[in-house]
Regions:
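Sec-dependent signal peptide cleavage junction
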Residues: 3, 23-42
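Ser/Thr/Gly/Pro-rich low-complexity, disordered linker/stalk segments of secreted
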Residues: 39-47, 482-515
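Acidic, glycine- and Ser/Thr-rich low-complexity intrinsically disordered tracts
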Residues: 42-68, 227-228, 233, 358-488
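Acidic Gly/Asp/Thr-rich repetitive segments characteristic of extracellular carbohydrate-active
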Residues: 53-105
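Right-handed parallel beta-helix/beta-spiral solenoid domain characteristic of secreted/periplasmic
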Residues: 71-76, 95, 99-101, 111-163
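Right-handed parallel beta-helix
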Residues: 117, 123-126, 149-160, 172-185, ...
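Short, surface-exposed beta-strand/strand-loop-strand elements in extracellular ectodomains
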Residues: 583-593
Length: 599
């Protein structure tokens, strides 16, 4: 493909169009890459099913882009840099393993600002490990405690702590492409640090955990633990609103992949969103060790009869010892959308979905249960899903919800179907060759950090509207409003072994974009006018097609003499056009003929 980037004009947002043309007539289609100024999540679309991955602009930058960065290369230098950091600072940690025998604490007086994060990242192309394994097993021995606001951490392995690898207690923070390994409680936990913070508005809020991995976290019974406290990720007990996990993988932890537990003593926690995430083999460590006390769920979504209506979308859960997804006695209107649960429950003999204690207003759509070992259980409203009950699979088709009163009481609804795994042409790949000892990030992630399951357990054909999908289209989150000295144009491409995703291009102006991108997909929808653009012209489905970000686009707006697209906006932004190889490489903008070039 060829790309053309227009000079800056007075538009309020980034507009992205894909151009497909024959030799004679060009045509406009749709670009799938959303560009947002979302360091705080204000414009970040955390509920969209259009995007199966997210990454930040920082992940696209090189160390050299941060001209005034401070480089550190010892444990003492790291602590000193953290304690003296101020808004806009960039701390780059040289490759290596850094040992700490006590907790590293960033208190709530050390903060970045909206648009001016404090950035702490691993040196390019180097591994950085914070090794806390000298700590003894003790609930006070967290490895890293972040109580500050507006921090970004990238590419760091938090290893071996006596309790949590990271206790995240601040607000508006981002962890990207970090690893939480072999800690003796939860790898990363969102909860208060100040125990006098008694109300939800004082608890950690609006944090984004993106493309991180947690594994082998275990509270070993032989060290005084129980084996049932160490999750991969947790947002529990005392966490506030707006926290998001996006593109994370949690596997081989002694307890749960995700834990959103709440209790009556502290009351409901804030709504947590989990999207584009994968949980597998929780309840068994990578060396095969299994502790029966572990809860072993992929996604545990509550506890104690204390309700919060959490959101889980486009997630995959397989081979966990207990359930794939459970309400865990959360009596709220949970929203579970496009989830795949495959072969969970082999240790605890539980169903793939156990949500019979949720509120009657709970909504389940696009769920698919496969190779279940016990009945799925629901309370709420189900549509476009396949579930398992009493040794049979039932399909609820269509776009209308069916109220499921309580499948645990033997209630059944829908059409009896075969186990989805036995139906031909319904999954891209059902051959799971993952070994627990594999380098999972190398195996299951693209170069930009987003998840690529290589088609494993991804539905296709008549089941394609159900279940989780990865490696389709990505969002970019801008973090470096003022933090970087060099807001230059960056480019990212997804690399994978079995599927191809077109390279995505993102462009950053001197000031952050004020809202999410607005896009137009003529293949699925036609809007002649909205608040930002007006289109006049003819459409065609005979000009060929283009593959872009995993989508096949077939309907186009023909670029003819009478065709016009006008924009009505009032602040700086940029327009990106993407051409296929047959385009004549010429286009007229504001009456000026402009030539497209490669790149």
């Amino acid at each position: 493909m060829k790309r053309f980037k227009d000079m800056k004009s007075k538009w309020a947002l980034i507009l992205a169009f894909v151009m497909i043309v024959s030799v004679v007539v060009p045509a406009v289609l749709f670009s799938a890459t959303d560009n947002v100024n979302a360091a705080t999540g204000k414009s970040y679309d955390k509920t969209s099913l259009s995007y199966t991955g997210t990454y930040t602009d920082i992940s696209l930058k090189k160390d050299a882009d941060f001209k005034n960065a401070k480089y550190v290369s010892s444990s003492d230098e790291i602590i000193s840099a953290l304690q003296s950091a101020k808004a806009g600072d960039v701390i780059i940690i040289k490759g290596g393993t850094y040992k700490f025998s006590t907790s590293v604490i960033v208190n709530n007086t050390i903060n970045g600002q909206d648009g001016s994060y404090i950035i702490v990242k691993a040196e390019d192309n180097h591994d950085v490990k914070f090794d806390f394994s000298a700590q003894v097993f003790n609930s006070q021995n967290r490895g890293f405690i972040l109580d500050g606001d507006y921090w970004y951490f990238g590419g760091i392995n938090f290893y071996g702590a006596g309790d949590n690898g990271v206790l995240l207690a601040g607000n508006n923070n981002i962890f990207e492409r970090c690893v939480f390994e072999a800690n003796r409680d939860t790898g990363l936990q969102l909860s208060r640090y100040d125990t006098t913070a008694a109300t939800k508005d004082l608890w950690p809020s609006n944090n984004l955990i993106i493309n991180c991995t947690a594994f082998n976290n275990c509270d070993f019974p032989e060290q005084g633990g129980t084996g049932e406290n160490a999750d991969g990720f947790a947002a529990k007990l005392t966490c506030g609103e707006g926290n998001v996990f996006d593109g994370c993988i949690s596997y081989c932890n002694s307890d749960d992949g995700w834990d959103l537990y709440a209790k009556t003593a502290t009351g409901p926690i804030g709504v947590v969103t989990i999207r584009n995430c994968v949980a597998f083999a929780n309840g068994t460590l990578t060396n095969g060790t299994h502790y029966a006390n572990g809860d072993m769920n992929g996604f545990k979504l509550g506890g104690s009869g204390v309700g919060t209506p959490h959101n889980v979308l486009n997630c995959l859960s397989f081979d966990n010892g207990a359930t794939g997804f459970t309400d865990n006695n959360n009596p709220s209107a949970l929203t579970l959308t496009n989830l795949t649960a495959w072969g969970n429950g082999k240790n605890a003999k539980k169903g793939n979905f156990v949500c019979y204690r949720a509120g009657s207003g709970a909504e389940y759509s696009g769920l698919i249960s496969v190779n279940a070992v016990d009945s799925d259980k629901f309370m709420g409203n189900v549509k476009n899903s396949i579930y398992y009950n009493s040794k049979k699979y039932y399909q609820l088709s269509g776009d209308s919800f069916t109220q499921i009163l309580n499948t645990s009481a033997g209630y059944k609804s829908g059409t009896v179907v075969n186990n989805p795994s036995s139906a031909s042409g319904t999954f891209k790949n059902i051959n799971n060759t993952i070994k627990y000892t594999d380098n999972i990030d190398e195996l299951l992630r693209n170069a930009d950090g987003t998840i690529n399951m290589n088609g494993l357990y991804e539905t296709t054909g008549s089941y394609s509207s159900m279940g989780a999908k990865f490696n389709v289209a990505n969002q970019i989150v801008y973090v470096t409003g003022k933090s970087s000295d060099n807001d230059k144009e960056t480019e990212s491409s997804s690399e994978n072994t079995s599927e191809t995703t077109t390279a995505q291009e993102t462009t950053k102006s001197d000031e952050p974009v004020s809202s999410a991108a607005h896009v137009m997909n003529f293949t699925t929808d036609i809007t002649e006018q909205n608040a930002y653009f007006t289109i006049s012209g003819n459409y065609s489905e005979s000009k060929g097609s283009v593959i872009y970000n995993g989508m096949t686009l077939t309907k186009c707006l023909k670029i003819e003499t009478a065709t016009s697209i006008s924009f009505t906006c009032d602040t700086d932004s940029e327009l990106t056009l993407v051409f296929n190889s047959n385009f004549a490489k010429k286009i007229k903008i504001d009456g000026v003929k402009t030539a497209a070039t490669n790149g």
